[in-house]
């Protein structure tokens, strides 16, 4: 909780508007990657799930988020920002109504949308960047999320490296302003993120791109595994609540080890 509180203090000092702080969880157990992936997909199905197996490690992710999707000259991003716990016995409609009217969650999401619009605008033609979905609620096994979709038409002669530089890392796991906030994340977080909050996907021969955000993930070695989760800190955040939210996000993965 001290790190979350330190992030909030840096915001009060004017260093950032929003900081996405993550924490790592470690389990000293042997995990079968294929079984873990199967369990995760059954418990928490998500559209961007994947399993990567190598000789030295495996990476399992059940990501719901698209960072970059390029189809011909259209570039799209689908940021997720804002989280509510989903309880077994709840009036879903009333919970969603409260979620959509929560000032902190709405402010967090709006800042994220502005950040991603700016990122898209740097590589898209003027006047083409638009919101096609705004602040919609998507429900998963343990959580409700606020989601928006933003797209634009790419400028002529834009190179792949320019797109990747503009859009990565995704704003939903950094905060804003992006560069300064990443510097604060580097100061505050005690662990290197590794593949967590990176991207995985396809770069097609025809120039199309599909890259997700590596969250809801588990990095598996022979005798141990790691998972990591993060939450957004804004000026009116409660450090204890954000710490609890991070635990909720990690729970779906940690339960696979039991």
Predicted regions and their residues:
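Extended alpha-helical targeting/anchoring segments
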Residues: 1-258
